[in-house]
Amino acid sequence: MTLTDAPARPRPRDAGGASPMSLWRLLWLELRRNAMPWMFPLLAALFVFDPFRTAMGYGPFWDLRASVLENKLLPDFVLFVAGVAAWMGSRDSRRHTRDLVDATARPRWTAQLTTWAATTLWVAAGFLCCVAVLYGVTASQATWGGPPWWPVAVSLAELALLSALGFAAGTFFPSRFTAPLAALGAFLLCLEGFRNAVGRSSVYALLSPTTYVPDDDTGLFHHYLPDVSIAQLMFLIGLTLVVLAALALPRAADAGPRLRRAAAVIAVAGLAAAGTAIGLTGTARTQAYGTVIPVLHDGANDRPIPYTRVCGQAAGVPVCVHPAYRSFLPAMTAALVPVLRQIASLPGAPARVDQVVVNDLIPSNGAAIAGVPPVFRLPVPATPDETSFGQNASTFRNSLQSTLVTLFVVGADGFVFMGPPGGSPAQQAVELALLQKAGTAIQTGGGPGNAHAKAEQVATAARRFAALPAATRHAWLAAQLAALRAGRITLAQLP
């Protein structure tokens, strides 16, 4: 029999447990002896080069930047948390000592929970330091809203679960290889969960924190819906309780009847919480501004967030955006001025430019020129300077101009992607001419055979139309715009 198999020192049945002060001293001792702080330099480097760098590429919007906590920072922590927790769980067996068994008058299960708590506290401290840096920088840049805490709570709950799983693996399978295997297993589990959950709406996908990717303007026009976050917390905390209760099962845990009954109650409560979360998530439905779980949903979150628009002027036309996009306004007005000057006073020219919600589930909120007087309704991407789509400031400017010109010439009244000109050949030629005079470099689509020849004809007509004096172009558009929009103008009829 090895030293670690030896039963804990028996306690008199009438003796009381150790005082809370002794438990605090044990926790302090475990905090000092924990291996997690040695991982912080590596985690700090990962934070700077992955989550923080990604977040700084987004606009200064709280919910959008907070998304990196769950889909970037959390996966970076997974490997280290599971590995260190397994290392701490197998520490006593690897050393073949009884020092921790004799160091406390409490049952071994209590000592194990204290070691796990110390590891988890260090993990939480490191994670919250990263959150503080990210939120601190965002607070110095954001002009609207405040920090979202639901992603932080869900991330901490998942880290606690991973710590419990790693610690249990180290306790039940003590070996020098347990820690690296636990780290690898946690990483593969996270990777597989992300692969199977992204783009799906199943219960598994909704309960996976690493799949959270919000819309660009989440938390700006409408409230963040915490329904799924609440279900995730119930699920993760429930599983954590089950894993910790399982540590009381072995005889070496020295858990008497009372502690075993307490562990059983904890396990049942954890299973109930996890099962309830799964059941509630099964009733979830996707709405325009988030996922709703009826039992957990607060109807007050369905109301739009009131705000006062911030406006600028582009060629005498008001350009209004959400206050959070205040820093984007100069770039937007500068991009729209050369186009609005060319189409001023023409039929259908916008009298105002308004920002609308970026949401693929609401087609009516796409780019359009509609209303009386006409209003250019424009969804603005959250990252005009540098986006995940590779969009830079020049591309953002060209996209705004191309979208406005296409909507004006084609007369579209619905969703239009920011992109190259569309419509009939004559419409494309007019669009290219207007964009050329605005300083936008747009190429016509080419191709083999007839397609290439047609593109050359469009480009030639566009150059011919752009070479006209501004007054002549304006007068022709004023007289022929209705026929052009109806598709009755051919390339040969363009002046």
Regions found by a protein language model. Give the residues of each.
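Membrane-embedded alpha-helical segments of integral membrane proteins
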Residues: 187-252
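Membrane-helix interface "capping/anchor" motifs
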Residues: 33, 170-179, 253-254
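Secretory targeting signals
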Residues: 50-80, 85-87, 113-177
